[in-house]
UniProtKB/Swiss-Prot annotation:
It comes from Mycobacterium leprae (strain TN). Residues 1-49, 207-229 are annotated as: Disordered. Belongs to the GrpE family. SUPFAM superfamilies: Coiled-coil domain of nucleotide exchange factor GrpE, Head domain of nucleotide exchange factor GrpE. Homodimer. GO terms for biological process: protein folding. This is Protein GrpE. GO terms for cellular component: cytoplasm.
């Protein structure tokens, strides 16, 4: 065994990460790292990997936004369809009760709804239907509207300058929102422009029996004129 040179200088390298004197973490030169210097091209690959991840995140974000938009549109469409179905069902039920309202109108004409339990029932039913959005229309003197009114009698020649108005209401019409549930059956008269006012061709009143028959059958009624007209 050959002994070493007793005068050879021994070099001791302190590889401790923390300096025992200062307590601070020592910086390690790049060449002293366990892996040595970074392999060539690693920086470029890291940059390319980062770009790829950014593109992937952008793609997934776009997909998520598209799915969210599709769901929002679906939810709006579902709510709209649900409301439409609800309105249709409501209109169907209320339409079945219009005949009852006609009976109440005839009872009111005969004075049967002036007081008593029947008046209370009629008022409560009409209040409930009004709360659901039911609106009655068809009033004497208002302009005739073929969208809302069905004319079963007509007085006047409809000449130039005349305007058709409702002269008699044989059966009220009803609307639910913008939907016409039933047209009003009316008698129409033509107004003629006069001096500062309008002259109206008058139709003789129709008794309640005739109104009932016309409201149920929808037959035309021959207008009656008073003597001297």
């Amino acid at each position: 065994m050959t002994e070493g040179n007793p005068h050879e200088q021994v070099t001791v390298t302190d590889k401790r990460r923390i300096d025992p004197d200062t307590g601070e973490v020592r910086s390690i030169p790049l060449g002293d790292t366990p892996g040595g210097s970074e392999p060539a091209g690693m920086t470029d690959r890291s940059a390319n990997s980062t770009d790829t991840m950014v593109d992937k995140v952008a793609e997934l974000t776009s997909d998520l936004q598209r799915v969210q938009a599709d769901f929002a549109n679906y939810r709006k469409r579902a709510l709209r369809d649900q409301q439409t179905a609800s309105d249709r069902a409501k209109a169907t039920v209320i339409s079945q009760l219009l005949g009852v309202l006609d009976d109440f109108d005839r009872a009111r004409e005969h004075g049967d709804l002036d007081s008593g339990p029947l008046k209370s029932v009629a008022d409560k039913l009409m209040s409930a239907l009004t709360g659901l959005g039911l609106v009655a229309f068809g009033v004497e003197g208002e302009d005739f509207d073929p969208v809302l009114h069905e004319a079963v009698q007509h007085e006047g020649d409809g000449g130039e300058g005349s305007k058709p108005v409702i002269g008699d209401v044989l059966r009220h019409g009803y609307k639910l929102g913008d939907q016409v549930l039933r047209h009003a059956l009316v008698g129409v008269v033509d107004t003629i422009a006069g001096d500062g006012a309008e002259t109206v061709a008058i139709v003789a009143p129709v008794d309640s029996t005739a109104k009932t028959e016309q409201g149920e059958l929808g037959d035309n009624v021959t207008p009656h004129k008073e003597d001297g007209d």
